Amino acid sequence: MKICLIDETGAGDGALSVLAARWGLEHDEDNLMALVLTPEHLELRKRDEPKLGGIFVDFVGGAMAHRRKFGGGRGEAVAKAVGIKGDYLPDVVDATAGLGRDAFVLASVGCRVRMLERNPVVAALLDDGLARGYADAEIGGWLQERLQLIHASSLTALTDITPRPQVVYLDPMFPHKQKSALVKKEMRVFQSLVGPDLDADGLLEPARLLATKRVVVKRPDYAPPLANVTTPNAVVTKGHRFDIYAGTPV
């Protein structure tokens, strides 16, 4: 995959070249998207809109730390949707990991989560965030046990994953309403890189065959159900709904 690669560390140790080789990235000086290695982290920038800033994965500080400490925990919609109850903490495959936020919420309340991400740039961002998270004194211990990254396309990997999870979680990119003020700066950068998941409808069936209990699909409230398969079961929040489908028991 071609992207502009920029090293701002000043270290001159070739770390960016190693990273590019690992994730199959090729430097393209004219690409509008840039993957930048800073002294602190790896980040994604949209070069024609510098005011949008850089996107990076941070499980330790910022919004994720606040959500971990002061968020709803088990009361969060995604936790309710996957079926967390009492001692039941399902094993989850997040087949559209993105920046790992929902996966992190589930891991922070006790679920073991395997994240799938097919875009190599996003996978590199996730891997960088995980490495910093694993090294953190406060959360590193449980994060290593509960949150892992698999760099693969969900369309093929969903048939190969073992052991089977109890829950498969899907949050495919859906085109945002153009005038929506809710399309945050971060989303604009992210969508410029990955675009909408045009093949997302193909995920539902393999997800239902893989999950032993249920499949949860996060959708904007204005979006049709995935693959146009309706379900009466959903957890509804302001702006979104989590559609729930039966899996395939062992």
Curated annotation (Swiss-Prot):
Transmembrane segments: none annotated. Its main location: cytoplasm. One of its GO terms (cellular component) is cytoplasm. S-adenosyl-L-methionine binds at R101, D102, E117, R118, S153, S154, D171. One of its GO terms (molecular function) is rRNA (guanine-N2-)-methyltransferase activity. The keyword S-adenosyl-L-methionine applies. Its EC number is 2.1.1.242. It catalyses: guanosine(1516) in 16S rRNA + S-adenosyl-L-methionine = N(2)-methylguanosine(1516) in 16S rRNA + S-adenosyl-L-homocysteine + H(+). It is an enzyme of class 2 (transferase). It comes from the Bacteria. InterPro entries: 16SrRNA_methylTrfase_J (IPR007536), SAM-dependent_MTases_sf (IPR029063). Keywords: Cytoplasm, Methyltransferase, rRNA processing, S-adenosyl-L-methionine, Transferase. It is found in: Cytoplasm. SUPFAM superfamilies: S-adenosyl-L-methionine-dependent methyltransferases. HAMAP family: 16SrRNA_methyltr_J. Belongs to the methyltransferase superfamily. RsmJ family. Specifically methylates the guanosine in position 1516 of 16S rRNA. PANTHER family: RIBOSOMAL RNA SMALL SUBUNIT METHYLTRANSFERASE J. This is Ribosomal RNA small subunit methyltransferase J. The lineage of its organism: Bacteria, Pseudomonadati, Pseudomonadota, Gammaproteobacteria, Enterobacterales.
